[in-house]
Amino acid sequence: MSGQGKRLMVMAGGTGGHVFPGLAVAHHLMAQGWQVRWLGTADRMEADLVPKHGIEIDFIRISGLRGKGIKALIAAPLRIFNAWRQARAIMKAYKPDVVLGMGGYVSGPGGLAAWSLGIPVVLHEQNGIAGLTNKWLAKIATKVMQAFPGAFPNAEVVGNPVRTDVLALPLPQQRLAGREGPVRVLVVGGSQGARILNQTMPQVAAKLGDSVTIWHQSGKSSQQSVEQAYAEAGQPQHKVTEFIDDMAAAYAWADVVVCRSGALTVSEIAAAGLPALFVPFQHKDRQQYWNALPLEKAGAAKIIEQPQLSVDAVANTLAGWSRETLLTMAERARAASIPDATERVANEVSRAARA
């Protein structure tokens, strides 16, 4: 499907969970001849990341309202109005055929600006429970899609766009069937790490002994303290890295993952075909719990919520999974994934632009 001459503006910012799926869709459409620009904020990760992908970015000034003081809330309508004016001026100059909102504060003023100019607004909700911005924008959107069922009652479930190197991994049967020796446990707390996993997993390693080998992503500035915790637990042999650049290689190595359940992490683990022990971040709306629930229901994962997390709970869960069980869970994870999510989102963007 050629997009020659068509123009898309992607609105996404703040976290990798919003930005990376947006980049996947942008690259897919650029390969079809689309022109793509990005709407973001200058002080968040998209400011550095998006230009590295060969995409020009425009900035508006906007930030979140949750947890702000009364003065900030009083000033909020004016700030939103100014951000809307900035976004509207950018869109009047660029003249996109369609805008794609992938979440983050920038999507709010951007979506309203597009709607006020008669530009179709397509939304994608990455999480199992809808964010505030997308809840508002859904009322004016041309099309609403969701990664997991339940965020919106009638929205199409299309999955989350994930990186092509993860999608290219061999299927679980090819990867895991012949494996022997200690079970390979990948511990991931997101790019910032997760203090609770950094504190718990060295003690889990001590309980499980030689039955596991662990690769632990500690997050920024925590590598030394986590290595020390493993050494003090009598388990210095395990690998601790601050950040994992090649997640596809880490998934290929692993037999099971112990991790938080951010939307992109859950979708990548399903696409890779891996069993998981999820420890959702304790957010007010339990967003990460709802992200992980479909894989637990599919028999591909177990959720331990943070108040119930203990060394024994993790150790007993991992010890209870034989290699045969892990392979069955891995196959269920892969079966629950939506590997063509990028294409599905891109197709809806194309349809909205032609309507």
UniProtKB/Swiss-Prot annotation:
Identification of the protein by name: UDP-N-acetylglucosamine--N-acetylmuramyl-(pentapeptide) pyrophosphoryl-undecaprenol N-acetylglucosamine transferase
Family that this chain belongs to: Belongs to the glycosyltransferase 28 family. MurG subfamily.
InterPro entries xref list: GlcNAc_MurG, Glyco_trans_28_C, GlycoTrans_28_N
KW Membrane (keyword) present: yes
Entry GO CC: plasma membrane
Name of a matching Pfam family: Glyco_tran_28_C
Listed Gene3D superfamilies: Glycogen Phosphorylase B
Functional pathway: Cell wall biogenesis; peptidoglycan biosynthesis
PANTHER family the UniProt entry points to: GLYCOSYLTRANSFERASE, UDP-N-ACETYLGLUCOSAMINE--N-ACETYLMURAMYL-(PENTAPEPTIDE) PYROPHOSPHORYL-UNDECAPRENOL N-ACETYLGLUCOSAMINE TRANSFERASE 1
Keyword Cell cycle: yes
Entry membrane topology: Peripheral membrane protein
Protein task: Cell wall formation. Catalyzes the transfer of a GlcNAc subunit on undecaprenyl-pyrophosphoryl-MurNAc-pentapeptide (lipid intermediate I) to form undecaprenyl-pyrophosphoryl-MurNAc-(pentapeptide)GlcNAc (lipid intermediate II).
Gene: murG
Compartmental location: Cell inner membrane
Organism: Shigella dysenteriae serotype 1 (strain Sd197)
